[in-house]
Amino acid sequence: MEPIVKQENPVTTSTLSTWKPAARNKTIPPPESVIELSSSNEGSELGENLDEIAEIQSVDRTGGDDVSGTKRARSDSIASPAKRLAVMIPDDDEEFLLSTTSGQAILALPATPCNVVAAPSSWGSCKQFWKAGDYEGTSGGDWEVSAGGFDHVRVHPKFLHSNATSHKWSLGAFAELLDNALDEVRSGATFVNVDMIQNRKDGSKMILIEDNGGGMNPEKMRHCMSLGYSAKSKLADTIGQYGNGFKTSTMRLGADVIVFSRCLGKDGKSSTQSIGLLSYTFLKSTGKEDIVVPMLDYERRDSEWCPITRSSVSDWEKNVETVVQWSPYATEEELLCQFNLMKKHGTRIIIYNLWEDDEGMLELDFDTDPHDIQLRGVNRDDKNIVMASQFPNSRHYLTYKHSLRSYASILYLKISHEFRIILRGKDVEHHNIVNDMMQTEKITYRPKEAADVSQLSAVVTIGFVKDAKHHVDVQGFNVYHKNRLIKPFWRIWNAAGSDGRGVIGVLEANFVEPAHDKQGFERTTVLSRLEARLLHMQKDYWRSKCHKIGYAKRQGRKSAKDTEKDTEDRESSPEFDPKGSASSRKRTVPSSFKTPTAAPRFNTPTAASEKFNPRSNVNGGGKGSVKVSKDIGYKSSEKGGKLGNSFSKSNKRAKPQGARAVEVTNSDDDYDCDSSPERNVTELPGKSSELPKPQSGPRTLSQLEQENNELRERLDKKEEVFLLLQKDLRRERELRKTLEAEVETLKNKLKEMDKEQASLIDVFAEDRDRRDKEEENLRIKLEEASNTIQKLIDGKARGR
């Protein structure tokens, strides 16, 4: 027999007139087969008081033989829809079926207890997020023992606040909610709308996040409100994986959140709509010692929405009272009106009681831009805002820290054209940072542990920002993970001067794990190697192309792969990991340990001028790695002579520099390298691995003198480079002074022009006044002449 699926009729849908809440002050006697929900003498008093929050008591599993294993049955004699729905409580936590009067079967879940403390603690007037966790709850109460004699560990309401502190940045909380909406694309979502609305109760501002995705049925709604549950971790191409984002993000933006969700029926089930309230204000004000979430569920029957009661009608009424009292809506009818604003499916999240800063103003700024949500405080830099208007290609770098519109435009590497992100009535235009770059290069990076090349690899697009010729201090890598921006403009190279300016990059690294707040990555060896590799890329790119954007060409400098200063620059990074970056340091082998026939020939002046790095004693894996003593001295195992002592006596200045060295770098491109952390032996070409005996005599002295001369020449070259840098610095300072002088001159000229303009205005005014007076005199003379002529004409006429 085909199952009967009831279709929703959008024309006759009504959420207000078809069902009315039962009377709050009326006690309904339960049927004989239903267990009375009571474990306290105060139950009747709490049920009669409308101002107090009622409690859904748990069933006493140890109080009588006839109670254990008994299921609550439905009474078909109850007339109203609310009374007609009684629930059976199973022995375990699995899903169970509610049989309706028509014989249909409804899938439901056990009710979540809503424990209430009669003596509420003071909430206080603290509306600052970082101080909201400082409150004293009530002392410990009776601990319930669940089935099997195991204790049920409570989750204190303070955990909601401490859990939300993982978001140091409020816009990161918005990103979590946008991730949830984007994941609904697989369920048919075409938009997510973020807006600011007014609270009708007190006129305060609230945040609205809504989408037209698949919605949540009662079971998914309870999973959403739970901690740590995530079905997305098993799905491909989804961002969420920890089951913690909704709670941390909403509690970071405001103290309370209410969720409305409507879901279409599947597999013969009816459509459902649910309301869930996660209120930190409610939990603190009532002195809760456990997190409880009032929820209301409704089921579509023909053209009517009927409530789904999970324990009893009185418990349903208590949940309704709790939601109405602590939500922004005054009645249950106003709550149900929110479902009229969505279509057949979707979710509306409303965050209210938004957090304030130390000055008593909202952390979020809704007034500066009517189509944006911005941050106040340290994340907002007025200088960057002015620069963003001057340098449009660097706008996202300068504004993403305080502007949600700017941050949301670069939040995803790729986004479907059919999906819209609407922020306060205006679409957010997706932006690819690559479009802001010039002279781009693409480099494929594969980590050492790469097993699947298609998944564990990253294509790094690196280039100059188009405003780099203005020497704007913009640099960093935008690192994405599964299409989501995790590290915006990650600054890796912290050079002392202007090195690295203007170099930006984009990559998607799916082989590193993001942190829980998705604003960084877990510190692992893989991340350290990626960081070191990106540092090499940026240095190579900068030193080969910096002259194209107006900087002096770095002559005589080595590339990032060969320079001995890589380690020092790497250590200057704020996220430096000595263990993780050890493999990227260089190893050197003094040429005095090699026979003349095995000595390498240097093909370039740069390679020939490499100096010995005294810190090269690093035990790292990789091809060609060598373990060498930190001191140049080497004790011969055959004669016991000290080469280091004779070397230091011959030339003390040459000791720290050492002899000519061969440098071998370890990069992640060497896939066939040994994975062991240390190798003590290096095979030299054409020779055995045994070290030769140290030489002595005039030949050794002449060799040392020759090497000393070479060291002096290299030192002179370094001094030339240093002088060149000093020259660049002086030129920059002179340029700055010149610009400052020009600015001052322009200011003086502007003042003079203002004075000249004022004097010209005065002259013109005087001329106008003088001209007016002359015109007046001429007018008077003209009138007198006219009168004289008229008199003469009249006299002549009379004489005739």
UniProtKB/Swiss-Prot annotation:
Residues 1-76, 552-702 are annotated as: Disordered. The gene is MORC4. Its cofactor is Mg(2+); Mn(2+). Residues 36-47 have a biased composition (Low complexity). Belongs to the MORC ATPase protein family. It comes from Arabidopsis thaliana. InterPro entries: HATPase_C_sf, MORC_ATPase, Morc_S5. It is found in: Nucleus. This is Protein MICRORCHIDIA 4.
